[in-house]
Amino acid sequence: MSNKFLTSVCCISMLQLPLAITNSANAEWESSANVGVFSEYRFRGAKQTEDAPAIQGGFDLSHSSGLYLGNWNSNVEFGNTSIEMDFYAGYGFNIGDISIDIGDLYYYYPDNSGQTPNINSNEIYAIASYGAFSAGYHYFTTEWFGVGDDSGTSYMQINFEYPVSESVTISAHAGSSKIEGVNGSDYEDYSVSFGFDMGDGYALGLDFIDNSGDGAVGSAFASGAVVSFSKSF
C-alpha cells in the first residue's frame, strides 16, 4: 500500500520523453516513470509480500501550475490478492521557503473487487517540506483496508534527508498510525535509509525498518532491512 508493478517496456519508453502540451498560458506537462526490484515490500513499517521480493513501478504527469497525477503499482501477498494499484492526484505550491503538497490517494486491489472485506481504500493527505525536513498528515476517508470504522484512521510522519555526497543520501523517517475503531492496533514505524545514485537514473537503496506494531498484526510488523535497485526515466 504505497504511497508506491512493472510497467511494460513499451510504456516506459514512451514515458521517458517529456510531454510538452501548450495551451494559451503556455503551461507545460511533463512525464516521468520509475521501475524497481525490492527484496520485499513494506508499507508504513508492515510487510506486504510475506518476505518475498517485489517488482514496483509507476508514472507521473506534472503540470507547471503545480497540478499532478500518477499511478504506482506493486505485487502483494494478501491471500488471493496479488496486485496493488495506487492512483493519486494533487497540487503542489510554495509559501515562502515552505513547499506544500495536498492530494488524494486511492489504493486499488483488482483481485479483491467484490469481495468481503473490501480492502480498496482512499486517503487524503497534506505534506509540508522545508529544507531537509518534511512532515505529513494522511486521513482515510474510507475504512482502513477493510479494518476499523467507516473512516477516520490517520497517519502522521516526519522525515529528514541529508546528501552526504553527490551520490550518497541518508534519510530518517518516523511515522504514527492511529487505527480508528480497533483497540490496540495503533503503532509507530521508523526507518533509516541509504540511497546510492549510480548515474543515468539508476539507484541502489538500503532501508532499515523497525516499528512498535508486533502486538497488532503479528509477524507482518517484524523489523528488517530492504535492498532495492531502481531506474528512473
Predicted feature residues:
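Outer-membrane beta-barrel proteins
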Residues: 2-13, 23-233
